[in-house]
């Protein structure tokens, strides 16, 4: 597997409103623990669309992993000016991650017009990656459901790699990181 998409909940879907909230430490560690074995098995590219939350945290993780591993980050935004209506802190966060990317492009080369651009993003990313890592719990639906449904279909039809990190996996990392010896 050479390329993988990483996506999941937006931060506010998880009740997290700051990029550096305590919970983000655990989320980023969980993503890191799932990416490292894939990188060691030959993963070359991590693809995100630059959404707030899981995707930008994944971008931060990949930026750090690039110091030790031969991994690259691509940010494929669904449309131009995706972050235009975000607050200043979130815009800066997105710019930091895009600045660390090895590749940045827009799937549709125009500003937001309709939800169809999100569907186009999902289809394009699934069609151009070998798999996906989702921070998504089937027991708590949210915005990742649309990507999950398409990726699940790709898995069934075309042997697409699909791994979901659920809340139990996140809790395992929290407990592991907080263990005292």
From Swiss-Prot:
* Transmembrane annotation, as ranges: none
One Pfam family matching this protein = YpsA
Superkingdom classification of source: Bacteria
Tell me which InterPro entries the record gives. Answer: YspA
Listed HAMAP family: UPF0398
Q: Which family does it belong to?
A: Belongs to the UPF0398 family.
Tell me what this protein is called. Answer: UPF0398 protein lin2003
Question: Where does this protein come from, organism-wise?
Answer: Listeria innocua serovar 6a (strain ATCC BAA-680 / CLIP 11262)
């Amino acid at each position: 597997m050479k390329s993988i998409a990483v996506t999941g909940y937006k931060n506010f879907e998880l009740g997290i409103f700051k990029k550096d909230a305590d919970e983000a430490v655990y989320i980023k560690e969980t993503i890191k623990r799932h990416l490292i074995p894939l990188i060691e098995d030959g993963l070359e590219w991590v693809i995100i669309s630059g959404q707030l939350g899981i995707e930008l945290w994944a971008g931060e993780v990949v930026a750090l992993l690039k110091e030790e591993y031969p991994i690259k980050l691509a940010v494929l935004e669904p449309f131009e000016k995706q972050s235009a209506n975000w607050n200043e802190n979130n815009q800066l966060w997105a710019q930091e991650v895009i600045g660390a990317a090895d590749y940045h492009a827009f799937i549709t080369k125009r500003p937001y017009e309709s939800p169809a651009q999100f569907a186009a993003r999902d289809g394009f990313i699934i069609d151009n990656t070998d798999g996906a890592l989702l921070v998504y719990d089937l027991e708590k639906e949210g915005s990742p459901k649309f990507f999950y449904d398409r990726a699940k279909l790709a898995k069934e039809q075309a042997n697409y790699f699909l791994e979901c990190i659920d809340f139990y996996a996140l809790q395992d990392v929290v407990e592991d990181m907080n263990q005292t010896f």
